């Protein structure tokens, strides 16, 4: 952008959560760009407008391939601020493991955030341990897909679940946008169960920050605080009145948090 100090300009790479796509950053992206930053929002495989079908994606690494290809193309002298939301924290961690030298800091928003000690499945299981045991799934559906001999199950959020658990602080129009654009979710539980811990040399060498969403009814707020305290970050922030989708319900505040993190640590 003309007139922007090149030293202050940052490159933010935005990684969406399960079922979502690059579209979910539609409010935040122009806000960061209006501040002079470069912003790249990606679609992971079988997400957003990516043309892959869910039954064509076997592993979490496959699912994360668009992000890994983007990171591979980043020039050696450039570093990005990697921003992962929700389940996108796993893809963010994979990118950190493979390209630590290209990331100035990774920011996790209401997201799973592994460490360099435990396997990823440890944190995957903790999400369910922290979640209410008697939670009503409402109109969420579990659907089989793929090979009939070895079927997998996908999750499809219904309008009631979206509006009351994930987008409860968003407008009717924003919720309808999600209803129209969300795609089925596969959580790669079997793949995660076989994965080894991320390394201290790769993932563990990248600075981390965390942004808690204070009214999150989807990803337990208590678990978000637990991750901050037990996994460790160099900066933690909390967005008041934010539901799980802070980039939609509180985009200005999220932009401010990201700017403050970038200014402080980059």
From Swiss-Prot:
Mainly expressed in roots. It catalyses: 17-dehydropreakuammicine + H2O = norfluorocurarine + methanol + CO2. GO terms for biological process: alkaloid biosynthetic process; jasmonic acid metabolic process; salicylic acid metabolic process. GO terms for molecular function: hydrolase activity; methyl indole-3-acetate esterase activity; methyl jasmonate esterase activity; methyl salicylate esterase activity. Pathway: Alkaloid biosynthesis. Residues 11-121 form the AB hydrolase-1 domain. It comes from the Eukaryota. Keywords: Alkaloid metabolism, Hydrolase, Serine esterase. The active site is at 86, 216, 244. Signal peptide: none annotated. Its EC number is 3.1.1.123. Pfam families: Abhydrolase_6. Transmembrane segments: none annotated. Homodimer. Hydrolase involved in the biosynthesis of curare monoterpene indole alkaloids (MIAs), natural products such as strychnine, a neurotoxic compound used as a pesticide to control rodents, and its pharmacologically active derivatives, including brucine, used to regulate blood pressure. Curare alkaloids act as animal glycine receptor antagonists. Catalyzes the conversion of dehydropreakuammicine to norfluorocurarine. Belongs to the AB hydrolase superfamily. This is Norfluorocurarine synthase 1. It comes from Strychnos nux-vomica. The lineage of its organism: Eukaryota, Viridiplantae, Streptophyta, Embryophyta, Tracheophyta.
